[in-house]
């Protein structure tokens, strides 16, 4: 029997639980008007209005087995030379993904952990320092690590962009046949939130490419400065699309919703999380994936701080623009594992 509900409230603390309560009206006001109407089916599948919407797989088990379960649910096996794109974490930041959490998945796909350098000012701004951070944070102990822009970057085309016609990524990306975009979902001081779309855009961008995105294609030498917040947010979506297009059919996306600070892993002294961990989600559609994570954050009883961060930066624009340019769909089916 199908029971209609107007909003999903999922409470995931230590045990697996999915609960649906309240009314869509209040949820849509807090989030945005396009929150899809969902209903629960007998097989625990949460289905938006369009039954053929992209699947997003969810588990509340934030452990190696949970991570493996959502990866396997995708039905797309990472093959060839596999890159696993993570955030190595700024020294002093305790919130980046734990190597012990991701080790089994990385080794199952025989993956190489990949990253790109940041702009000057960070302790990950050059390859030598960045490799040392990766070692200090335990990543070199579980897999090879490659800094994609350690020697050069390359231009890849952006199709359908409003601001960008090209995107600058680490040149060593061409060494890999398949991309696993493994992201820590959290707040962000510039983008409002960081998930798959940010990891695909700023994450794969070279040091100069990061400036290119922040400046909406005006310069490669401005660091993090943005003349227009909205143009920056839309440029992130466009840069993400260039990576998705390059690896079409050879890329998948996983978001881990733990250590949910309002700040990103690039800060050495981030704010402490003020909400409980939620779970791990995976999809073949990065827009659907980030949208599902945002919806879960909005539905959480303790999500006020991260919601405030998202809204104060107009962060939902990145998702909206990503859908507009054809990167993916905001409608999704959330399937519990």
Question: Language-model segments: what does each one mean?
Answer:
Residues 35-56:
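N-terminal low-complexity, Pro/Thr/Ser-rich intrinsically disordered segments
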Residues 21-39:
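Sec-dependent signal peptide cleavage junction
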Residues 50-337:
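Extended, low-polarity segments enriched in aliphatic/aromatic residues
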Residues 1-4:
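N-terminal secretory signal peptides that target proteins for export/translocation
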Residues 10-11, 25, 33, 52, ...:
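Intrinsically disordered, low-complexity segments enriched in Ser/Pro/Gly/Ala and basic residues
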Residues 7-26:
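Sec-dependent N-terminal signal peptides of Gram-positive bacterial secreted proteins and lipoproteins
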């Amino acid at each position: 029997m199908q029971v209609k509900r107007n909003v999903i409230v999922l409470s995931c603390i230590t045990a697996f639980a999915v609960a649906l309560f309240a009314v869509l009206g209040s949820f849509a006001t807090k989030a945005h008007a396009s929150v899809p109407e969902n209903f629960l089916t007998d097989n625990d599948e949460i289905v938006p209005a369009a039954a053929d919407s992209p699947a997003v797989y969810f588990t509340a088990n934030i452990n190696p087995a949970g991570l493996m379960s959502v990866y396997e649910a995708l039905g797309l096996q990472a093959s060839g030379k596999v890159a696993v794109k993570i955030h190595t974490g700024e020294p002093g930041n305790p919130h980046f993904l734990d190597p012990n959490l991701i080790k089994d998945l990385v080794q199952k796909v025989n993956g190489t952990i990949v990253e790109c350098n940041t702009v000057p000012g960070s302790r990950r701004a050059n390859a030598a320092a960045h490799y040392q951070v990766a070692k200090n944070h335990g990543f070199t102990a579980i897999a090879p690590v490659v800094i994609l822009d350690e020697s050069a970057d390359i231009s890849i085309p952006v199709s359908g962009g409003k601001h960008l016609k090209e995107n600058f990524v680490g040149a060593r990306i061409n060494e890999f046949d398949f991309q696993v975009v493994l992201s820590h979902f959290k707040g962000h001081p510039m983008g409002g939130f960081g998930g798959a779309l940010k990891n695909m855009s700023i994450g794969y961008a070279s040091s100069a490419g990061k400036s290119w995105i922040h400046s909406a294609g005006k310069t490669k030498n401005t660091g993090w400065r943005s003349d227009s917040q909205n143009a920056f947010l839309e440029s992130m979506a466009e840069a993400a699309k260039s990576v998705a297009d390059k690896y079409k059919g050879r890329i998948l996306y996983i978001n881990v919703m733990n250590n949910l600070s309002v700040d990103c892993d690039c800060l050495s002294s981030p704010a402490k999380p003020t909400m409980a961990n939620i779970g791990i989600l995976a999809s073949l559609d990065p827009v659907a994936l980030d949208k599902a994570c945002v919806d879960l954050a909005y539905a959480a009883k303790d999500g006020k701080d991260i919601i405030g961060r998202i809204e104060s930066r107009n962060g939902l624009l990145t998702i909206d623009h990503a859908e507009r340019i054809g990167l993916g769909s905001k409608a999704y089916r959330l399937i519990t594992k």
